[in-house]
Amino acid sequence: VTSALEPALDSFNCRRTLDVDGQAYDYFSLKEAEANGLIGIGNLPFSLKVLLENLLRHEDGRTVTSDDIRAVALWLQERKSDREIAFRPARVLMQDFTGVPAVVDLAAMRDAMAALGGDPQKINPLAPVDLVIDHSVMVDAFGSDKAFQVNVDKEYERNGERYAFLRWGAGAFDNFRVVPPGTGICHQVNLEYLAQAVWTREANGGDALAFPDSLVGTDSHTTMVNGLSVLGWGVGGIEAEAAMLGQPISMLIPEVVGFRLTGELRDGVTATDLVLTVTEMLRRMGVVGKFVEFYGTGLDNLPLEDRATIANMAPEYGATCGFFPIDEETIAYLKATGRKKSRIALVEAYARAQGLYRESDTPDPVFTATLALDLGSVEPSIAGPKRPQDRVPLARAAEAFAEALDKEYGKGAEADLRVPVKDKNFDLGHGDVVIAAITSCTNTSNPYVMVAAGLLAKN
């Protein structure tokens, strides 16, 4: 029986070898596939090229056929498709809230295997799984340099049994790692440590196999890692378990909306202001079930941390993902976050060989639809009062708050009401800022907005 992780066919004769600093890697060449019948695929959006490579690598004649592969090339004709394909992500990302049931299921499968007289040690994830413990923290202490340690200690006290179980799972199962509490939000850990941009594994009877990093995760903001050119999005627990066991994710070949960025952000304008503007534009267009891919000369002026902020909010603008291609900034970020030199060399060499590397003069891909934004036009903004996708220009903050107080909450008559605070020498009224907290996974990997939030909290 052919493994779900090892291809049986190569209908387009595109399996080649790439040498990087003396290390040989097998890979499925998109350029060779184009030369061997997949005409025009060099014009595909970068995100669809990643999907296409995934199909070429997993062609088995059953879950992935040559017609499925041709359908991606034919997407260029109508710039959309009703073809359903089987996508196998390279890995799975979980957090402790949804990940514990998955580990319980694996343990139950081992019990069942033992009851049937088989070897329970054969039950393991086929795709690599990283479970980041981040959803159990509670803020008991704050406003102190000791707050972090106090909160971590209480977290261990409250969740000792769960954490002991996960620690057992990390030791018992192959292909399963647990990132301990207090390390960071799972999407931050994924972006800064786990993601590789190009993944490798040992191939059966050959050199190591190189392919684009991709994943599904059990949290909607898994999309953050698309800022690092890693295709991924959030799925339900059952789908994640299926992917963990080597089963494909069924999906339609998506429409891809191209979002052209030009210019650069003005001083004092942050990635938060930008992402609120992008979200407003994309929600107006309607991108549910679609990929969004960012392109244009503005990418040359957009740090990877800002790209990750934009990619993170894909659930808020409704897209499956917001993808950024590999370029010079991607390589610089991998270096800055301490990835291995050999991996960084592979990422650049592989991306260039596959036509997955963006440069300033790279021709624009073909998209289903496009829209554009001059980064210089973005203005300072806030969100709310209820939903993160509701952008309010900072200049309109007072006016927007007064409107919301009256229309949303029916308290317009109390706008000027002040209430003395017992045992304090101040009073409070509607509109006063009483809590300043840095909590969102959207911001935790962006030092610029972290500093801005800290200054706001301080003042």
Which residue stretches match the model-derived regions?
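Fe-S-dependent hydro-lyases/dehydratases of central metabolism
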Residues: 1-459
